[in-house]
């Protein structure tokens, strides 16, 4: 099979590999689509350690071709996911308390185990989430990572219908966060970005207020127009966005951190204490979160913006990512 494999010189080779036989509890997927994520770029570049030889991809959707012994959750013909959360230990405090993505023995697709950017992929059947009918595989691939990440973040913000939520960063992640906040949680959305083009799209997608934080004081405007957001989700990777989010929420507000800026965040501790503001981190989502995120997309409440590309384009896509030319989600199409 053809696969996108990381090389020692931080490149990706599209090469031929042979998969091993299935073990107990595993399933073989014939891949249809696999999204390309910034995390793939980090893995390729060795930012998280040398991953030479690994097959990239954690936004994969495939059709079950074969199941191994003991598999009851999947059957041939089902569509299922290859997600970042590939497998947990299944018995630690995190796995047993609904926080399985925090498992200290977690395996991650396209990082610690081979991922879905190949014509075929082996998954642990109980950890592969089924894709509902009516949801296209290309759209589902984006929900597998960006979608479930933002859905979980908005869920964790504890936002309620009619309340104000500020979304910082309206790129691939932020656009989906906006849709989940608006169309699933029925919140009023404040879109905050430094790019007017992204803000225009956000307004078209239903944002109630759009602010360019490069030219305006976003926190000040949010406080003046709404009395302070009830919550904020930060997908941007700039330290300034995190600091602004803390200033933009009202007393009792919650800031959910999703983006990973290289710098440390500055926190006004007295304000956090006196105004009861919470700052929490959110990492992807559980299998249940992904099931829910898929269903809302299948119902048409969330529509990822995707562009289909051939596997041969993978290095070009990474170059475009590094140059900031990507709009929406790039998806490798294995169906043609």
UniProtKB/Swiss-Prot annotation:
The lineage of its organism: Bacteria, Pseudomonadati, Pseudomonadota, Gammaproteobacteria, Enterobacterales. It is an enzyme of class 1 (oxidoreductase). Its EC number is 1.1.1.1. The gene is adhP. NCBIfam families: PRK09422.1. It comes from the Bacteria. Binds 2 Zn(2+) ions per subunit. SUPFAM superfamilies: GroES-like, NAD(P)-binding Rossmann-fold domains. Keywords: Metal-binding, NAD, Oxidoreductase, Zinc. It catalyses: a primary alcohol + NAD(+) = an aldehyde + NADH + H(+); a secondary alcohol + NAD(+) = a ketone + NADH + H(+). Pfam families: ADH_N, ADH_zinc_N. SMART domains: PKS_ER (SM00829). Belongs to the zinc-containing alcohol dehydrogenase family. One of its GO terms (biological process) is acetaldehyde catabolic process. This is Alcohol dehydrogenase, propanol-preferring. InterPro entries: ADH-like_C, ADH-like_N, ADH_Zn_CS, GroES-like_sf, NAD(P)-bd_dom_sf, PKS_ER.
């Amino acid at each position: 099979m053809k696969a996108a494999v990381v090389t020692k010189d931080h490149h990706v080779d599209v090469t031929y590999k042979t998969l091993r036989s299935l073990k107990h509890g595993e399933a073989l997927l014939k891949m249809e689509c696999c999204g390309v994520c910034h995390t793939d770029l980090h893995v390729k570049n060795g930012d998280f350690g040398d991953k030479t030889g690994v097959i990239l991809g954690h936004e994969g959707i495939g059709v079950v071709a074969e199941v191994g012994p003991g598999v009851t959750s999947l059957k041939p013909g089902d569509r299922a996911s290859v997600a970042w959360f590939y497998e947990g230990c299944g018995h630690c405090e995190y796995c047993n308390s609904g926080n399985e993505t925090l498992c200290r023995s977690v395996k991650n697709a396209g990082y610690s185990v081979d991922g879905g950017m190949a014509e075929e992929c082996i998954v642990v059947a109980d950890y592969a989430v089924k894709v509902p009918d009516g949801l296209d595989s290309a759209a589902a691939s984006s929900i597998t990572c960006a979608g479930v990440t933002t859905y979980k973040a908005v869920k964790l913000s504890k936002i309620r219908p009619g309340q104000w939520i500020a979304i910082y960063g309206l790129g691939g992640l932020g656009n989906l966060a906006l849709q989940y906040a608006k169309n699933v949680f029925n919140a009023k959305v404040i879109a905050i970005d430094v790019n007017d083009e992204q803000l225009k799209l956000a307004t078209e997608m239903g944002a109630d207020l759009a602010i360019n934080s490069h030219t305006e004081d976003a926190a000040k405007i949010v406080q003046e127009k709404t009395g302070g957001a009830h919550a904020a989700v930060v997908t941007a990777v700039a330290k300034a966005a995190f600091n602004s989010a803390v200033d933009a929420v009202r007393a009792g507000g919650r800031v959910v951190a999703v983006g990973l800026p290289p710098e440390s965040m500055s926190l006004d501790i007295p304000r956090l204490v006196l105004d009861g503001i919470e700052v929490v981190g959110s990492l992807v989502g559980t299998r249940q979160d992904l099931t829910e995120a898929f269903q809302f997309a299948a119902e048409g409440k969330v529509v990822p913006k995707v562009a289909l590309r051939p596997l041969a384009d993978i290095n070009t896509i990474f170059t475009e990512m590094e140059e900031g030319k990507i709009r929406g989600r790039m998806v490798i199409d294995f169906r043609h």
